[in-house]
Amino acid sequence: MDTIENNVYEITSCFAIRIVHLYKYLTEVRHEYIMSKQLFRSGTNIGANTFEGKNAQSRADFCNKMIIALKEATESGFWLDLLHKTDYLTEEQYTSLYDDWNKIMGVLTKIVKATKQ
């Protein structure tokens, strides 16, 4: 397996863990339940789909899992922006999460483009 593909599992897993901790913070401390649940769902699904891609039955199946992960990542970016713009995330929290999110978007985009060729 390519180094970039190995790397995507690690970074999406770490991101999912951060999202779980953020969800706990948002619900327990900030008492925000709607947007945080959406982010929880999409943010953890990124890792779930990249993990499923490890056992893909074909190149097309692998590509499909990475496309789904990319769509989930795109949605997660929306929820991060919204939580930040509605003052549920500080600038520091947002910037840190956004940097990780941006890295994931880049890696997944690269994998999808390479796999489609």
Q: Model-predicted segments: where are they?
A:
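Short, C-terminally biased terminal segments at protein or domain edges
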Residues: 1-48, 52-117
